[in-house]
Amino acid sequence: MPIIKSAIERVKTNNKANVRNTAQMSAMRTAVKKFEAAKTAGADNVDDLYLAATSAVDKAASKGLIKRNKAARDKSRMAARYAK
């Protein structure tokens, strides 16, 4: 455990950021999985789920949770899947 006050504060800050980042990554993954499942099942709301998934990927990239190249790759794969 840290002894210096600033180190204690950094541990608290890092824990808060970790919780926030984990939640946003989970939400992004869930949105992508919902789109994939709906596309496979041939659901009616595929359009809305596609927009939600691409938005979630863009948001994760803008927050620095994933790299821009991974975001572009994921969106490209979803777009190809959406077009089929």
Swiss-Prot record:
Keywords: Ribonucleoprotein, Ribosomal protein, RNA-binding, rRNA-binding. InterPro entries: Ribosomal_bS20, Ribosomal_bS20_sf. This is Small ribosomal subunit protein bS20. Belongs to the bacterial ribosomal protein bS20 family. Gene3D superfamilies: Ribosomal protein S20. Binds directly to 16S ribosomal RNA. The gene is rpsT. GO terms for biological process: translation. It comes from Lactiplantibacillus plantarum (strain ATCC BAA-793 / NCIMB 8826 / WCFS1) (Lactobacillus plantarum). Pfam families: Ribosomal_S20p.
